[in-house]
């Protein structure tokens, strides 16, 4: 008579509860981040800003994210990550709530700074916590599910920014997004669990995997990080400007442009992320380089589709965008898993913080503003087309990195 409740408790493990709460926070993180691109033409109109100035708003968020990453990573390897995750979620939620009272460009810029610091805290610790709950063989599956929140959150952010912003004013979607973030942060403080560091690690702790100095001589970590950085330059710039591009070049309204990008992102994001994770999981059984190789092919297939979006006939813009996003999302879980697997638990939070610093410093911190500056001097298609160069570089780095992929041991899974 008592076996059913016991079985239920077993199925709803601390790992599963923490995993679900982290997915919820990650979802809201990306909703908040992508409201700005969705509402960008509305905000630009009110502030009378140039494209370069609007790009600088996204740059501001990633710049402060990047600056906060080393300090938060250092803390995450030394103290409990649970209160730090909660603090980060509360900070970005309060900054988002405060957007309702923003009435000038520089006030919005300051808001972006606080959001960046809050997001850096969460973005570093969540993958590290999940890596301590789940062994190497299962991390690709777990992180692929976790990162599904990126396209879903981005799609909801685009849609909220464009549709709600057009109907009720661009401040409304920020206000609506802030409240759930505070609620889930409270739930995480109560129900989230802190796993023992390294409890699920089975890879040998070699010096270049388990020390801070060793990270800089760890080719698997460095190539994964720089390949992702070049990819992030393109993705960050494109995601910041794509609704505006469709509004200007495809003749869509602000609401329809944002809804179109949102719909494509959620379908491609879920399908691409889950299919990429599934293919990589099966490929890993026969080839330990699979995480890097799948990421390489994902980027290679994106390049011609992206060129068609920016420079092809208008009739092919939407189909090509659909194809490009699908291929791009294939690598979300595998590439992030490759980076997490390349380091040991004692320096994992530090490694993730270095990874985040690099992908934002060399990637999306400056790409939205650079694209805006090129657009002011030429047009937005040329600005976005420049990102294709960085996709080529990313593919080359990932192919080189596949030579250094660590061999994974067979391990038992923590079930979800």
For each predicted feature, which ranges?
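Juxtamembrane intracellular "pre-TM" segments in multi-pass secondary transporters
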Residues: 5-11, 195-225, 249
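Extracytoplasmic gate region of multi-pass secondary transporters
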Residues: 36-37, 219-273, 332, 336, ...
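Helix-breaking motifs and short loop linkers at transmembrane-helix boundaries and internal kinks
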Residues: 48, 80, 101-106, 118, ...
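Structural signature of the two symmetry-related core transmembrane helices
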Residues: 83-97, 291-306
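Paired small-residue
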Residues: 95-98, 106-114, 316-323
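Cytoplasmic helix-loop-helix junction between adjacent transmembrane helices
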Residues: 111-150
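Helix-loop-helix hairpin linking two adjacent transmembrane segments in secondary transporters
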Residues: 146-190
């Amino acid at each position: 008579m008592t076996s059913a409740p016991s079985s239920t408790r077993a199925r709803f493990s601390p790992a599963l509860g923490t995993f679900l709460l982290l997915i919820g926070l990650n979802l809201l993180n990306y909703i908040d981040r992508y409201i700005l691109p969705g509402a960008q033409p509305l905000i630009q109109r009110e502030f009378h800003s140039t494209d370069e100035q609007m790009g600088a708003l996204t740059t501001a968020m990633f710049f402060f994210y990047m600056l906060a990453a080393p300090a938060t990573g250092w803390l995450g390897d030394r103290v409990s990550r649970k209160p730090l995750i909660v603090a980060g979620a509360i900070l970005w939620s309060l900054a988002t709530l405060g957007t309702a009272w923003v009435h000038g460009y520089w006030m919005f810029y300051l808001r972006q700074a606080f959001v960046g610091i809050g997001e850096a805290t969460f973005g570093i610790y969540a993958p590290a916590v999940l890596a301590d709950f789940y062994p190497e063989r299962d991390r690709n599956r777990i992180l692929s599910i976790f990162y599904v929140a990126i396209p879903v959150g981005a799609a909801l952010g685009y849609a909220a920014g464009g549709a709600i912003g057009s109907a009720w004013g661009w401040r409304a979607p920020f206000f609506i997004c802030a409240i759930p973030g505070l609620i889930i942060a409270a739930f995480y403080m109560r129900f989230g669990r802190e796993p023992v560091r390294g409890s699920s690690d089975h890879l040998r702790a070699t010096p270049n995997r388990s020390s801070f100095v060793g990270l800089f001589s760890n080719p698997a970590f460095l190539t994964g990080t720089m390949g992702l950085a070049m990819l992030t330059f393109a993705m960050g710039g494109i995601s910041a400007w794509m609704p505006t591009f469709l509004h200007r070049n495809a003749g869509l309204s602000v609401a329809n442009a944002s809804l179109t990008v949102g719909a494509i992102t959620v379908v491609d994001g879920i399908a691409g992320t889950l299919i990429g994770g599934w293919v990589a999981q099966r490929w890993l059984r026969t080839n330990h380089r699979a995480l890097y190789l799948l990421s390489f092919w994902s980027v290679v297939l994106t390049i011609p589709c992206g060129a068609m979006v920016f420079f092809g006939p208008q009739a092919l813009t939407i189909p090509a965008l659909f194809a490009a996003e699908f291929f791009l999302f294939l690598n979300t879980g595998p590439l992030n898993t490759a980076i997490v697997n390349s380091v040991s638990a004692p320096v994992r939070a530090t490694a993730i913080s270095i990874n985040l610093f690099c992908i934002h410093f060399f990637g999306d911190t400056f790409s939205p503003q650079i694209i805006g500056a090129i657009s002011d001097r030429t047009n937005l298609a040329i600005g976005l087309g420049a990102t294709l160069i960085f996709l080529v570089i990313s593919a080359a780095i990932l192919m080189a990195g596949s030579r250094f992929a660590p061999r994974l041991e067979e391990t038992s899974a923590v079930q979800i």
